[in-house]
UniProtKB/Swiss-Prot annotation:
The gene is smpB. PROSITE patterns: SSRP. Signal peptide: none annotated. PANTHER family: SSRA-BINDING PROTEIN (PTHR30308:SF2), TMRNA-BINDING COMPONENT OF TRANS-TRANSLATION TAGGING COMPLEX (PTHR30308). The keyword RNA-binding applies. Belongs to the SmpB family. It is found in: Cytoplasm. The lineage of its organism: Bacteria, Pseudomonadati, Bacteroidota, Bacteroidia, Bacteroidales. Its main location: cytoplasm. GO terms for cellular component: cytosol. It comes from Porphyromonas gingivalis (strain ATCC BAA-308 / W83). This is SsrA-binding protein.
Length: 153
């Protein structure tokens, strides 16, 4: 019997929800080499300044950081290489059409290990926020926090 995975590793892109309005969310598999998955299980990764793009009908994630595995030998991976994402053909076509429209992009939202031990990347079709939208988001968050404080008293 297989041993259960102890904890669900989760790496979030905190800037994505602040900088973008998320229109649609997908969960994609990600092609990794051995030392990359070992490093991710230790929680050594980052999604800062990461984005997705299409190349020859395939979806790739660019600038995703996965730290080199500490116990890796000369076979260790490159920390910021482009990695292929795995989605259904129907989802790929839908995303490609949507990303070609003006003002939309595909951004990674979070990276996690599922119950089967596979690395998954949650991506979102997003539209950039204007500066005043960001200010409104901050004000709304502060107002919600103050209301919660008042209710606790």
């Amino acid at each position: 019997m297989k041993e259960k995975i102890q904890k669900n590793i989760l790496i979030k892109n905190k800037r994505a929800t602040f900088d973008y309005e998320i229109l649609d969310v997908y969960t994609a598999g990600i092609v990794l080499v051995g030392t990359e998955i070992k490093s991710l299980r230790l929680g050594k990764g980052g999604l800062v300044d990461t984005y997705c793009y299409f190349h020859r009908g395939e979806l790739w994630v660019k600038n995703m950081y996965i730290a080199e595995y500490f116990y890796g030998t000369y076979n260790n991976h490159v920390a910021r290489r482009d990695r292929k994402l795995l989605l259904n053909r129907k989802e790929l076509r839908k995303l490609e059409e949507a990303s070609k429209s003006m003002g939309t992009t595909i951004v990674p939202l979070k990276l996690f290990i599922n119950e089967r031990g596979l690395a998954k990347l949650q991506i979102g079709l997003a539209r950039g926020k204007k500066q005043y939208d960001k200010r409104a988001s901050i004000k709304e968050r502060d107002d919600r926090r103050e209301m919660d404080r008042a209710l606790k008293r």
